[in-house]
Amino acid sequence: MNLVAELLCLLAFLTPLTCDRVYVHPFNLFSFNKSNCEELESLVPEGKKTFVPASIESQTTPAYENDLNKDQVEAASHSGQGQQALRYVKDFVHILGARFYSALREARQGQNLLLSPTSLYGSLVSFYLGASNQTAADLQGLLGFVPPSGDPDCISRVFGQEVFSSLRMIENLVKSRDEELQFSKMLCLFSAPGVPLSQLFVQDLLPSADALYARAVDFSNPSEAAKQINTFMEAKSKGQSKCLLTDVDPSADLLFAVDVCLAVNVKQVSRLKEAQEFWVDSNTKVMVPMLSFTGTFNYKTDASGTFSVVEVPISKTLLLVLLQPINDSDVESELPLQSLAWLQQLSPRKIRLTLPELTIEGSSDLQELLANMELPTLLGKGANLSRISDANLTVGKVINKAFFKLIGDGTDQPEDPTAQKEDVVFLDVTLNKQFLLAVFEEKTRAMLFLGRVTNPLHGL
């Protein structure tokens, strides 16, 4: 797989080595000994236990869902090896997230765009847990973890659980110290009527979300199936997830959907009294509500004068990175998002930042993204997903929906926003035209969201 080689080369670039530091191949951080393999083999009978999900039309909550969502997942270990594994995972999350973004941006020119790299990566891990043989090996390679020996051995289940543990650690850090934000993640499995699902597979997905649901849907009527799924997910998300699907594949046996939402009410940030101009393109402007941030933030302008970057803390655990083109340059075509260079060498500056209030969401089908990356068969009809079901599954859409909202807790503009000490000069940075954004967990620098804002009013 060319992509695998590219991922490993990029990881080598992202991971500087020093003479007093021993390099550990990322796969070794998730490897295990013979006794672990034997323990896995002993679980094979359990792994063959299946259940048939209740109908999506059922008005009562099935017992298996109560059991699943009562099962609390322990916090991930913060051991040295766990921290090192987390660093590798977050680098691969960044690389694949940038690849997925590149696959989407051309198809959605002129539109707001948002995806969650951690959520998309977690979806691939989910299918890896359900895959066998060559499909498992291909997914492992795409995820960036290729054993040095070339022999995957019996790694699938333990490897997937360890990666989920790292991803969950990141999400727990987001929520750990912040009352001013709301962060939630929901996973739904929709199977055709009568299709059995592996109990062990579904249980293994528990660390990947705050809530997990499995229901049966009749896909033979695509419009009705889409309507039922939309209604179900809107109800379970308390109105947050809307219009997830417009249609479904009537030949599908399984549809996978993840919905991740982040809403932040930034402290000590004011909303300007008057709406401000935002240029959708060179000829079109709209009036939008704006927020005003003042403080010392990390900032840089790239050497070629193509773009500027500012990094702003928006909570105790989150960083918002904003990237704006200079002189109407096409940043997306020139910026190597897969490299971390655009996030490096920022310097503290006194800045007065003005940017729109944001309510932005995006939905992507992992199947389409893989096809755009020339991997259309990875989860196609020939995929071996025998650990999900003993039926011969046809996977339909693999939906990942992301939602991000940014508001300020202040209602008024500061009385005198130009008042400054005589010896302090503030740099004015105003985002009043198309810009890119990324949201990172502050401690690990893991990328939670990546997106583009072309019109802040879309989504309000």
Spans of features found by a protein language model:
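Non-catalytic, conformational "gating/processing" segments within enzyme and secreted inhibitor domains
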Residues: 47-60, 64, 110-111, 146-326, ...
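Terminal peptide-recognition signature
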Residues: 123, 404, 445
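Extended intrinsically disordered, low-complexity coil regions enriched in Ser, Thr, Gly, Ala
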Residues: 134-144, 330-333, 456-459
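Flexible loop/turn segments at secondary-structure boundaries
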Residues: 329-330, 362, 412-413, 446-447, ...
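Internal alpha/beta scaffold segment
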Residues: 327-346
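Extracellular, intrinsically disordered low-complexity regions of secreted proteins
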Residues: 33-37, 331-334, 416-417
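Extended hydrophobic
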Residues: 256, 308-323, 422-460
